[in-house]
Structures are given as structure tokens and as C-alpha cells.
UniProtKB/Swiss-Prot annotation:
Transmembrane segments: none
Name of the protein this chain belongs to: Purine nucleoside phosphorylase LACC1
Effect of residue 247 to A: Decreased acetylation; does not affect ability to promote pattern recognition receptor (PRR)-induced cytokines in macrophages
Induction: Up-regulated by phorbol 12-myristate 13-acetate (PMA). Down-regulated by PPAR ligands. Up-regulated upon pattern recognition receptor (PRR) stimulation.
Keywords: Acetylation, Cytoplasm, Endoplasmic reticulum, Hydrolase, Immunity, Inflammatory response, Innate immunity, Metal-binding, Nucleus, Peroxisome, Phosphoprotein, Transferase, Zinc
CDD domains (alphabetical): YfiH
Described purpose of this protein according to its UniProt entry: Purine nucleoside enzyme that catalyzes the phosphorolysis of adenosine, guanosine and inosine nucleosides, yielding D-ribose 1-phosphate and the respective free bases, adenine, guanine and hypoxanthine. Also catalyzes the phosphorolysis of S-methyl-5'-thioadenosine into adenine and S-methyl-5-thio-alpha-D-ribose 1-phosphate. Also has adenosine deaminase activity. Acts as a regulator of innate immunity in macrophages by modulating the purine nucleotide metabolism, thereby regulating the metabolic function and bioenergetic state of macrophages.
SUPFAM superfamilies (UniProt xref): CNF1/YfiH-like putative cysteine hydrolases
Source organism of the structure: Homo sapiens
Lineage start: Eukaryota, Metazoa, Chordata, Craniata, Vertebrata
Localization per Swiss-Prot or TrEMBL: Cytoplasm; Nucleus; Endoplasmic reticulum; Peroxisome
Keyword Hydrolase in record: yes
């Protein structure tokens, strides 16, 4: 049984309602009868800016509530916006507020393919959609006569994407201004930074607002994440078309840009100017590497598994092997991550950190000791030959525990599976 039912009246010829109340009443009565008891959200979607003239009379898009409609409409929420993108996004917000995922869309057959194309852009696999034909008669007209669309062309899809992108760009930033944390250790020939959770448009509580990763298991669609990324690129000054994220696998695999890209990897290195590379983080450490002498850079994603596997030094070694970097020239900055105050592991997993150095573990004799992955990363980098003064892990902003600061950072430990993601990024200026 659907948790939400949407009725698409977006193509409604509203001046013809005077002659079509019975058709509309029949549809709404059927929905109310079959779904009102169990569905938590009944919605009519329509357009607020379509108007046209007939017999010299101009009509606007307000659903009339005479002839028995008034009482019935009390069961439905009417969402009326100037565009399909705005309407569906508003409906998505209402669905997400109620944490619903099973949705029935009752839509005229000639609009079904178009509706599916918009939904594919604005929703993720978290949602389960089913479609039902809205039976309409064009003679005497409840709906505008139009050609049934069976396939969306590439040009039409781009038009849909442009409409959505234009709408998303108009949305205000949430939770304050966009904030980028930088390090004085990284020379000015690089663009770099670490994002926080403020200044984006994501509205899901655990993803709000500057989420930078979309997953089939989360409610933030790619188009929203891409808009957040566009705003970051404008603020930081990099080219969003040349942006690459790590494909995390909690390993020590490194992609050397220019070679064949692996299916998954937890580090990237490059010496290409104008290319921005990024490591994800939401408790795991996003690490940025820079060599101002050889003009090369890298990023790594270090969770507790990747830390023990040596992903940080694997990134350093890739820079040395590929670009001729020297250990003494490479600087390393650790981005925000979970602290030992909030991160524990079972004792059998904690033993590996204790064997690396006892200072990496607190309360070792407990069933779930506290782990300091930042300290472990520094120790491994120093053991690998990186100069201690070339490692920054204690910057006042960068050293904040992601789990302890919900106003600033996303956290898997704190927020559970539907967590948001921040990044560390770097590029060589063109």
C-alpha cells in the first residue's frame, strides 16, 4: 500500500473545470476511498503560472472548489508551483518530512514518461514509485490535448536537467554561509580546502546542508549534490568539470591520474594543472598531500581499516614513484575526523592500533577501546619518512571531532546510515 499518493493535474485546463467536475470528483473520490485510510500524504500537483484565453476570457490556475469539491479537497494537499521541477521538489520535501518512501503517482498517460524523467533526476532508489493512469477525456477537455511521449530524447532530457538546475540554483543556502577550512602548510600554488556542513541546499536533517555525496541508500539525489559542488567550485575557484572524487573501498589502492581508473580506490595523485581531486570524509580522515617542488598533489580517504593498511603512505609512495617527489618536500594535512572521544572498536580490532603505538588506544583493557586514528596516521607518516613539521593534524579547526560538533560536520558515528559527507580537496592552479 502506497504511503503517499500524488495526482498529476499539471496539464489541467482549468477553465474547463466548470464542465468537468464529475471527472475530477470521480478521480479524487477513488483515491480518497482506496488510500485515505493508510496513505499518510495525499497530494494534488498543479502549475501556478499557466494561463490562456478561451472565447476572449483568460483563466488562471486555481482549482475551483464548488460542486462538491470543497469538502473532498480537504483530504488533499495542493502543491502549485511555476515549474515541474519546483513542484516535484516541494512534494519531495513534504514526503521526506514524513519519512515516506512508497509513492503512487496517478498521471495522465501522455505525461507518464515525462513524469518518470523528472522523478529519476530528483529522487533516489530509497523511494519506490508505482504509476497509475489518470483516465481523462480530451473532448470537452479536462486536460490540454498533447502528443503522448514514449521516449525522452537526449535534447528533452537536457531540457529537464536545465529546468531542475535552474531551480536548484535559486534556492537559498541553509545553516549559514559556505565555509572552507584551509591550511597554512599548503603553498599558494595549490587550491585546497576542507568543507563543513554549512552553505548548501540539502535539507534532510542528517544531510543538511552541504552534503557532497549521493548514494542509492540516501535521500539526496545527484542533482542536489552537484549544486552543492557547483557552489563550492565557485567559492574555491576550481573547475567543477574537472573534479574527481575517490571511489572509496576502505583499502590502500591508489589511482595515479592518467592511468586506467580502478573500480575502487582510496587515494588519488596527479600533477595535472586545473584538475581537482577530493577525498570523502564523515568521521574517516580526508587527507591532502602537496609537493610544491615537483608540483604534484594527492588525496586519501583514511578510515580505521585504510589507516592500518597504510593508505596515507601508499599515496606518498605513489607521488614519489610517479612524479619523482622527495619525502622532505611533501606536506600532509589531515582534515576533520572522529576523535578518540567518540570512536571505539572491539578489542581484537584495537590490538593492531595498540601494536602500532600504545598512544593510539585509550582504555585498552575495556571491551571497546577508544581509537585515535589521527595519531596512528601521523605515526605511520613519520615512520615512512615524512618530516614531523610537514604534517598538520592539530590545526584548531581541523582537529575538531566530527561527531562532537554537529553544527559544523557530518558524522557516521553520530548520525547513522543516512549521514552526510564533507570532503578534502586540492588542485594545482593553472
Amino acid at each position: 500500500m502506497a504511503e503517499a499518493v500524488l495526482i498529476d493535474l499539471f496539464g489541467l485546463k482549468l477553465n474547463s473545470q466548470k464542465n468537468c467536475h464529475q471527472t475530477l470528483l470521480k478521480t479524487l473520490n477513488a483515491v480518497q476511498y482506496h488510500h485515505a485510510a493508510k496513505a499518510k500524504f495525499l497530494c494534488i500537483m498543479c502549475c501556478s503560472n499557466i494561463s490562456y484565453e478561451r472565447d476572449g476570457e483568460q483563466d488562471n490556475c486555481e482549482i475551483e472548489t464548488s460542486n462538491g469539491l470543497s469538502a473532498l479537497l480537504e483530504e488533499f494537499e495542493i502543491v502549485s508551483c511555476p515549474s515541474m521541477a519546483a513542484t516535484l521538489y516541494t512534494i519531495k520535501q513534504k514526503i521526506d518530512e514524513k519519512n515516506l518512501s512508497s509513492i503512487k503517482v496517478i498521471v495522465p498517460r501522455h505525461r507518464k514518461t515525462l513524469m518518470k524523467a523528472f522523478i529519476d533526476q530528483l529522487f533516489t532508489d530509497v523511494y519506490n514509485f508505482e504509476f497509475e493512469d489518470l483516465q481523462v477525456t480530451f473532448r470537452g477537455g479536462l486536460f490540454k490535448q498533447s502528443i503522448e511521449i514514449n521516449v525522452i530524447t537526449a535534447q528533452e532530457l537536457r531540457g529537464i536537467q536545465n529546468e531542475i538546475e535552474t531551480f536548484l540554483r535559486s534556492l537559498p543556502a541553509l545553516r549559514g554561509k559556505l565555509t572552507i577550512i584551509t591550511s597554512s602548510l599548503i603553498p599558494d600554488i595549490f587550491i585546497h580546502g576542507f568543507t563543513t556542513r554549512t552553505g548548501g541546499i540539502s535539507y534532510i536533517p542528517t544531510l543538511s546542508s552541504f552534503n557532497l555525496f549521493s548514494s542509492s541508500k540516501r535521500r539526496d539525489p545527484k542533482v542536489v549534490v552537484q549544486e552543492n559542488l557547483r557552489r563550492l567550485a565557485n567559492a574555491a575557484g576550481f573547475n567543477v568539470e574537472k573534479f574527481y572524487r575517490i571511489k572509496t573501498h576502505h583499502s590502500n589502492d591508489i589511482w595515479i591520474m592518467g592511468r586506467k581508473e580502478p573500480d575502487s580506490y582510496d587515494g588519488i595523485t596527479t600533477n595535472q594543472r586545473g584538475v581537482t581531486i577530493a577525498a570523502l570524509g564523515a568521521d574517516c580522515i580526508p587527507i591532502v598531500f602537496a609537493d610544491p617542488v615537483k608540483k604534484a598533489c594527492g588525496v586519501a580517504h583514511a578510515g580505521w581499516k585504510g589507516t592500518l593498511l597504510g593508505v596515507a603512505m601508499a599515496t606518498v609512495n605513489a607521488m614519489i614513484a610517479e612524479y619523482g617527489c622527495s619525502l622532505e618536500d611533501i606536506v600532509v594535512v589531515l582534515g576533520p575526523s572522529v576523535g578518540p572521544c567518540c570512536f571505539t572498536l572491539p578489542r581484537e580490532s584495537a590490538e593492531a592500533f595498540h601494536n602500532l603505538h600504545p598512544a593510539c588506544v585509550q582504555l585498552f583493557d575495556s571491551p571497546n577501546p577508544c581509537i585515535d586514528i589521527r595519531k596512528a596516521t601521523r605515526i605511520l607518516l613519520e615512520q615512512g619518512g615524512i618530516l614531523p613539521q610537514n604534517i598538520q593534524d592539530q590545526n584548531q579547526d581541523l582537529n575538531l571531532c566530527t561527531s562532537c560538533h554537529p553544527d559544523k560536520f557530518f558524522s557516521h558515528v553520530r548520525d547513522g546510515l543516512n549521514f552526510g559527507t564533507q570532503i578534502g580537496f586540492i588542485s594545482i592552479k593553472e
